[in-house]
């Protein structure tokens, strides 16, 4: 027992009431460290109402907040990863998969839904960073291709939200092959004139940033998202120089022309609807009066 525990154990002061607060009611902003009511944070789509910091959000939750409520269907839901290489690092790959599936409730790191956005048919995908860092393996690549092919078949836009540390090392070349596979299907979409919008969220790194995440007809980022190939610490250790302030953050990339827009999560739905209706040459879902109110 420490000295401070001994002092408090002898203290005559005791509470007649026990704290009866369930776990998970409160959480803390990862930026400003403000204590937040969990339900309030969820209503703000995991954006801190105090400082505006965009925290990571569950992939399925993100997509359901984007799409209209009716007519949502999941694509390639039956695909599940396999440990073809019998890979083992500190743990077996199959054990890592089991743990990630239990923690997230998903079979792999990409969720693909088909639905509408203000009545406009779209296909939308989102990475789940909670599933092995959103890493891209064979199933993620296959789901991405399935989403792109569905968009081409329906002649509707495809939107993908990336949040990934890169290629999944446990699948070795099977993972790296997905970079070429996803890039190839996007080239096919481009030939057919089907729009693809890439939304880069925190973080988008490695093989994902080096493939489909930067191949959008329009590339959007959330505020302060970390975007790049290697992380800033790795680069600093390699070049042995101090990087510029904000290097690899969304604002730095926008200033240097690497992305097209930065959009807050609260504005994402309306912004995507406006962009997609223009790309598809469809009537805007907003009338002139509504647009003037938002400007």
From Swiss-Prot:
The name this protein goes by in its record: Acetyl-coenzyme A carboxylase carboxyl transferase subunit beta
Cofactor(s) this protein requires: Zn(2+)
Gene assigned in the entry: accD
Phylogenetic classification of the source organism: Bacteria, Pseudomonadati, Pseudomonadota, Gammaproteobacteria, Pasteurellales
Keywords for this protein: ATP-binding, Cytoplasm, Fatty acid biosynthesis, Fatty acid metabolism, Lipid biosynthesis, Lipid metabolism, Metal-binding, Nucleotide-binding, Transferase, Zinc, Zinc-finger
Family: Belongs to the AccD/PCCB family.
Originating organism: Mannheimia succiniciproducens (strain KCTC 0769BP / MBEL55E)
Pfam families, A to Z: Carboxyl_trans, Zn_ribbon_ACC
GO biological process terms held by the UniProt record: fatty acid biosynthetic process; malonyl-CoA biosynthetic process
Pathway: Lipid metabolism; malonyl-CoA biosynthesis; malonyl-CoA from acetyl-CoA: step 1/1
Catalytic activity: N(6)-carboxybiotinyl-L-lysyl-[protein] + acetyl-CoA = N(6)-biotinyl-L-lysyl-[protein] + malonyl-CoA
